UniProtKB/Swiss-Prot annotation:
A biological process term (GO) from this entry: photosynthetic electron transport in photosystem II
Keyword RNA-binding: no
Lineage: Bacteria, Bacillati, Cyanobacteriota, Cyanophyceae, Acaryochloridales
Function noted in UniProt: One of the components of the core complex of photosystem II (PSII). It binds chlorophyll and helps catalyze the primary light-induced photochemical processes of PSII. PSII is a light-driven water:plastoquinone oxidoreductase, using light energy to abstract electrons from H(2)O, generating O(2) and a proton gradient subsequently used for ATP formation.
Protein name listed in UniProt: Photosystem II CP47 reaction center protein
The keyword Thylakoid is annotated on this UniProt entry: yes
Cytoplasmic side: 2-16, 117-134, 219-233, 474-510
Transmembrane residue ranges: 17-37, 95-116, 135-157, 197-218, 234-254, 451-473
Recorded topology in the membrane: Multi-pass membrane protein
Gene expressing this chain: psbB
Keywords, alphabetical: Chlorophyll, Chromophore, Membrane, Photosynthesis, Photosystem II, Thylakoid, Transmembrane, Transmembrane helix
GO molecular function per UniProt: chlorophyll binding; electron transporter, transferring electrons within the cyclic electron transport pathway of photosynthesis activity
Cofactor note as given: Binds multiple chlorophylls. PSII binds additional chlorophylls, carotenoids and specific lipids.
């Protein structure tokens, strides 16, 4: 076809056979990418430490989506929850990856078939012999099938009736595992953090889709509505489909960034709002106070804090800390976490406990400031030492550790105390291996940040695509300016012969 590069899809407008082929090829590419990406991630994934080196720290993107649907084991015998020597059966990470690659190959062959055999009897009206598609009925068929799939996913896969269930965890991301989930039909089903609502809504939406699909298959639209919404134009289908996709992209960008039952922090990392609101810090303090109230010492109380919970309370795991143009996983930034040093408690020479002011999410650098329980500044690391009144040396600041590697140890020399204070502005203090990955010390975002950014951007682009194609189909007669005297084949295909089309006029050799 003699068309400019930005008009490539024009060839599909009046060609349902090759439109099917294009969609099959696109799905083949998506499935092939998913399977290939899964194999690549499996080749680079280190499952040895699910607490301090989880998949989201390693930049895994497709593995968390498999895990939340119930795939947690590998044919190599490991599980993302830390078990070894397991037998996951066929539906392991590798099994799902291979299934996608095989599906991709079959879809590729189907696309080739439909590209060659594009002029099927199926696409012609049996009464007139003219090319015709019953788009409202096709909409009903697609809606019915989508509803069936949606209902089946909710009623069987998620409930465990015929499937594994879904990833369910506690509010602090400590005890997650794949479990069958019962539907929640009450008001609590609208809580975005309640997995029962996911099940109930898939079942309900599936039933609605099945009923609506049957309605559109059996009932014809009124002629006035058919003409007003251009229901006979394939570009109407494109426009409304893009609308559905961009709406879904906006929704999932929101559920990923703000958090929900479908984006557990064990698989995708914490949200930025959990750092902003001191979510994990408050839970840690609550547990410590409860232990102290029951008679435990400070060392015992802090030693009872799970390392996993302490690791969440570290700014390097905040997805808002990574710039959009800093490529690579989180581990390429601050390094691979090795151990929790313990909770640092600072005191001045009077024995008064001091609290390090933590860095807000969008700061790249932040001063080291220590305050008392009332928020009054008591110590800092000054920029101009000559004018200093609150230096660590002047205030006699010391640091004691409770829990972790340094449990029970106290440091009094100012250089050491200051080094720990600088780390304490980032939350709990951890030891990192920066050698293995040649980590550069610049924070990266988690897959949560990448997913949100990508889907928000594509949703915006697709929104404009919806407006563009919607306008084209509503005002087609104005935009096209097609001369009504042109022959039908010239309108459909231009002046260029379509390969295999015997009806197109062409010059014969003299």
């Amino acid at each position: 076809m003699g068309l400019p590069w930005y008009r490539v899809h024009t060839v599909l407008i009046n060609d349902p056979g090759r439109l099917i082929a294009a969609h099959l090829m696109h799905t083949a590419l998506v499935a092939g990418w998913a399977g290939s990406m899964a194999l690549y991630e499996l080749a680079t994934f280190d499952p040895s430490d699910p607490v301090l080196n989880p998949m989201w720290r390693q930049g895994m993107f497709v593995l968390p989506f498999m895990a939340r649907l119930g795939v947690t084991g590998s044919w190599s015998g490991w599980s993302i929850t830390g078990e070894t020597g397991i037998d996951p059966g066929f539906w392991s990470f590798e099994g799902v990856a291979l299934a996608h690659i095989v599906l991709s190959g079959l879809l590729f062959l189907a696309a080739c078939w439909h590209w060659v055999y594009w002029d099927l009897e199926l696409f012609r009206d049996p009464r007139t012999g003219e090319p015709a598609l019953d788009l409202p009925k096709m909409f009903g068929i697609h809606l019915f099938l989508a509803g069936l799939l949606c209902f089946g996913f909710g009623a069987f896969h998620l409930t465990g009736l015929f499937g594994p269930g879904m990833w369910v965890s506690d509010p602090y991301g400590l005890t997650g595992s794949v479990q069958p989930v019962a539907p929640e039909w009450g008001p609590d089903g609208f809580n975005p953090y309640n997995p029962g609502g996911v099940v109930a809504h898939h079942i309900a939406a599936g039933i609605v889709g099945i009923i609506a699909g049957l309605f559109h298959i059996l009932v014809r639209p009124p002629q006035r509505l058919y003409k007003a919404l251009r229901m006979g134009n394939i570009e109407t289908v494109l426009s409304s489909s893009i609308a559905a996709v961009f709406f879904a992209a906006f929704v999932v960008a929101g559920t990923m960034w703000y958090g929900s039952a479908t984006t557990p922090i064990e698989l995708f990392g914490p949200t930025r709002y959990q750092w902003d609101s001191s979510y994990f810090q408050q839970e840690i303090n609550r547990r410590v106070q409860a232990s102290l109230a029951s008679g435990a010492t400070l060392e015992e109380a802090w030693s009872a804090i799970p390392e996993k919970l302490a690791f969440y309370d570290y700014i390097g795991n905040n997805p808002a800390k990574g710039g959009l143009f800093r490529t690579g996983p989180m581990n390429k930034g601050d390094g691979i976490a090795q151990a929790w040093k313990g909770h640092a408690v600072f005191r001045n020479k009077e024995g008064e406990e001091l609290f390090v002011r933590r860095m807000p999410a969008f700061f790249e650098s932040f001063p080291v400031i220590l305050t008392d329980k009332n928020g009054v500044v008591k110590a800092d690391i000054p920029f101009r030492r000559a004018e200093s009144k609150y230096s660590f040396e002047q205030q006699g600041v010391t640091v004691s550790f409770y829990g972790g590697e340094l449990n029970g140890q106290t440091f009094t020399d100012p250089p050491t105390v200051k080094s720990y204070a600088r780390k304490a502005i980032f939350g709990e203090i951890f030891e990192f291996d920066t050698e293995t990955l040649n980590s550069d010390g610049i924070f990266r975002t988690s897959p949560r940040g990448w997913f949100t950014f990508a889907h928000a951007v594509f949703a915006l682009l697709f929104f404009f695509g919806h407006i563009w194609h919607g306008a084209r189909t509503l005002f087609r007669d104005v935009f096209s300016g097609i001369d009504p005297e042109l022959s039908p084949e010239q309108v459909e295909w231009g002046f260029y012969q379509k390969v295999g089309d015997v009806t197109t006029r062409r010059k014969e050799a003299v």
